[in-house]
Curated annotation (Swiss-Prot):
Listed GO MF terms: ATP binding; CMP kinase activity; dCMP kinase activity
Main location: cytoplasm
Natural source organism: Acinetobacter baumannii (strain AYE)
Keyword Lipid metabolism annotated: no
GO cellular component: cytosol
Compartments where located: Cytoplasm
NCBIfam families with a match to the protein in the record: cmk (TIGR00017)
This protein's name: Cytidylate kinase
Organism lineage string: Bacteria, Pseudomonadati, Pseudomonadota, Gammaproteobacteria, Moraxellales
UniProt gene name: cmk
Annotated coiled-coil segments of the chain: none
GO biological process: nucleobase-containing small molecule interconversion; pyrimidine nucleotide metabolic process
Amino acid sequence: MTVQIITIDGPSGSGKGTLAAKLAAYYQFHLLDSGALYRLLGLSLHKHDLLEKLDSHLDMCVNYARQLNIKFETSAEGTLVFLDGEDVTQTIRTERVGEYASKVAAIPELRQALFERQRAFAQTPGLVADGRDMATSIFPEANAKIYLTASAESRAERRVKQLQGMGLDAKINDILANIQARDKRDMEREVAPLKPAADAYIIDSSELTIDQVFKLMVDYVNSRTVSN
């Protein structure tokens, strides 16, 4: 049986995670949050004092990537994420861990180490994969390819609200600077830079609600022969 795959790529804070989860629930597909994998690897390397030694200890870092002890659990509150048995669901969503992930994602050998782990998520009846290079690198055969973007300013505003909702302090200028720096790093990295696939459906969510974007996505996905 053919596995149907929907990819959602785009920059940090564009709403990929929220909408990927909604699509996966709507179609009853599996869900891959590739950003979580990079955040988990970045957090693990930081805990083992290796994040600042990527060049000198690359082989060791690659081994950590291949053996990463992670688990995803679905609960009434959403998806819980565990690293080495510890619940790190909130931790991996902080700005600091986002910076760890961006550093890790810029290393070709570490991206390759996570490649097969991501491919393994493609199981029947289907998969919704959210990330930066799902359509261009990991699942180029995807049935439906979506590129979700938004202005840096609107993404910063959303991120501040998200962090404040988690009880964390957040300053708009700092968040905006971080987003702009991550965009630059993601778009300019040597391997799998952030960009839409040639055949991607591009949505700018700057002035749209989640429900409006979701409807656009469902209409597009259905037109690509994936049915509910």
